[in-house]
A protein has these predicted regions:
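N-terminal amphipathic/basic-hydrophobic helices that include classical n-h-c signal peptides
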Residues: 1-17
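Intrinsically disordered, low-complexity, compositionally biased regions/tails
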Residues: 10, 74, 123-126, 139
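Short, charged low-complexity linear motifs
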Residues: 19-21, 120
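Amphipathic alpha-helices that form helix-helix packing interfaces
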Residues: 34-37
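Membrane-proximal amphipathic alpha-helices
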Residues: 23-27
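Short beta-strand edge/turn micro-motifs at domain boundaries
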Residues: 126-134, 138, 142-177
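A solvent-exposed, acidic/Ser-Thr-rich amphipathic alpha-helical stretch
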Residues: 32, 44-123
């Protein structure tokens, strides 16, 4: 069993007979796993503190993201200035759990008490072992508060057939005045 402070979630592992072509079902499963990981990060923080949350977030980054494939394009919802785009794994980790001097503006999106994450597809594009998805992701916190963001993910299957996030872009919906 993976080390994840007791708040594990399933990662996508393809079997040997799976096609290299990414399916819509795999995209849906990847979004569900990502949401489950975010909830696991929140619960580990609430129950065991920042070190446990960091452990779960590291596991999520290792299993869901493609940092071992090359540059992951990561743009968090609430980021700006010189740190708008996170070009390193450390930058992505800081966004999820905060508590780092290198990213003082990050309060830790993953430790906001999330209880549910639901995605709604606007469109997806699949070309073999690469896929892109965009839509809305709704987060519900422990008090019933709702946050809805515009989200895009890009995925690539690695050599083992595991779907990995290589693009993560999130923004708040446009609010006309």
């Amino acid at each position: 069993m993976p080390v994840c402070a007791g708040y594990c979630f399933t990662s996508i592992i393809a079997d040997e007979e799976m096609s290299s072509e990414i399916t819509e079902q795999e995209l849906a499963t990847a979004r569900k796993i990502w949401g489950d990981a975010l909830v696991a990060i929140s619960k580990s923080f609430e129950n065991e503190g920042i070190d446990a949350a960091r452990e779960v977030a590291n596991y999520a980054l290792d299993t869901a993201y493609g940092f071992d494939l090359g540059q992951v394009l990561f743009k968090p919802t609430m980021a700006g200035g010189e740190q708008t785009f996170r070009t390193t794994r450390e930058g992505a980790l800081a966004y999820f759990v905060g508590h780092t001097d290198e990213y003082p503006g990050d309060s830790g999106f993953g430790i906001k008490g999330w209880r549910s994450v639901v995605s709604e597809t606007a469109a997806s594009f699949v070309d073999g072992d690469v896929a892109m998805w965009m839509g809305w992701v709704t987060f519900i916190d422990k008090d019933g508060g709702i946050t809805k963001v515009d989200k895009s993910w890009g995925y690539k299957k690695d050599e083992a057939g595991t779907l990995r996030i290589v693009l993560h872009h999130s923004s708040l919906p446009y609010q006309p005045e």
